[in-house]
């Protein structure tokens, strides 16, 4: 049975983990890092770059490099590369494919099953888009799990037998969640982890802190009469510098942002050298920090607990490393210190791997009960939002309610599904619409239409409507207005596979070119260093092959390079044969070379000098 992996598909960075012997292990990527930047780039030659290599080249390839695509999941966002439009799902799939490949390299086997995490406050369309990204990447998505829930799973399994409340404060690169979970164990050491309440903001994360620094630096330049707000290259360099400054200010009280030749104006080059203190940084971002308070208070209120009831506070997401964040959490929690014993970058992926192990039967000692983050309902007369499933309801769940017609002899009803907490549907998120037709003619208020909402364990919604009078039924899986059809997903899977094959071919061609250059250089040097020892015909033949390879390397035909490379690989052996035959002749070189020549050229003599014996310990022999 193939193993399943757990994937934290983050806005800024992503992580993959797997269970080994029942315990989670974070898998390092091909570059040696335990986190992989969620950055995808299309090089001008057509190669798709993912991760650290994509991030490093961003400043020179701005329009073809995509970062923070997670913020576009579940929307109709697209990016145009060479006339082809890519959806957020397709770009995310590239990151997932890299994580999948790195896991396969580590495990030495194919990986097809995965648990992927999403922010707890992701709506239905965003969850569906994440599942589709996994499918495009060639993964069978076993489960979509909320990030704070996964973190609590990783943190809470080693807790004692008493029921304990864990508050997870998750501030990532692009999203923010707060969740309260109850963790308990029975006498058989079986753990139950149940989400009590969750709240969040899908438009708040470390990227916003970075942007405040970028805006500040742009304003500092504007004061000097320099406007770089439209300079894409300068903006990318500023973004990278802002992210680095944010990280440095987590451990230092001040940092220096120094960017030489940031841009060029008619007056000459623009250099930036600006000191940024932690106090100034916190002042620039204080309103962002303020936005984390309401979700925190909402969770405490919805769970109906006191702050003193919280046993553990876990910080998740790289952005929680900012001192102002951990100080605020301590303040909000009534002075309780957050736990510092977990890696905020890795704990979500570790929890996802544990859940993958549960679903595959590798772990049988835990039950995870999640909740739906937002209320679900339909539009009724007057545009009213009528809830069928309230937020923070444990999932999977199923609810039904009976509605009637608004007009006499109404032949059909439109079922419009919404997600949100507002009183009117216009203020909530529309998820989809379908129509139930064939209702028997009757005065208004007489027909009975039963609407059923069914939320699966992934948090994805299925809705059905049934006319109790005629028995007619209509149903749909809510996939959001921007979800992909089965045909779209199949096409994108095929496209991704083709790209993977192209990328592999390109890598092989590059490796061949590198090896060919090295071979041409070394053979050239060997001929030059041993010119007096080589017969003219051998020297001429091999040199011709070297020259042919060099000429092929100047061109763009990879097949020609490969052919010339293989030809030189074969012919260069004649050089060694000629050199060693010279060394073995009576007037040739003696010593080490001569001995080596004898070993290589005179097998019978060498065999005569070999004594077949074994070593015996004298003391052992006497026993």
UniProtKB/Swiss-Prot annotation:
Q: Which UniProt keywords apply?
A: ATP-binding, Chaperone, Nucleotide-binding, Phosphoprotein, Stress response
Chain segments carrying region Disordered: 496-515, 579-609
Alphabetized GO MF terms: ATP binding; ATP-dependent protein folding chaperone; unfolded protein binding
Q: Where is the composition biased (Low complexity)?
A: 587-603
Query: Would the keyword Nucleotide-binding turn up in this protein's UniProt record?
Result: yes
Kindly indicate whether the keyword ATP-binding belongs to this entry. yes
Superkingdom, natural source: Bacteria
Record's Pfam families? HSP70 (PF00012)
* Bias (Basic and acidic residues) ranges: 496-511
Induction statement: By stress conditions e.g. heat shock.
NCBIfam families, per this entry? PRK00290.1, prok_dnaK
Q: Name the family.
A: Belongs to the heat shock protein 70 family.
Q: What does this protein do?
A: Acts as a chaperone.
Question: What HAMAP family would the database entry show?
Answer: DnaK (MF_00332)
Name this protein carries in UniProt: Chaperone protein DnaK
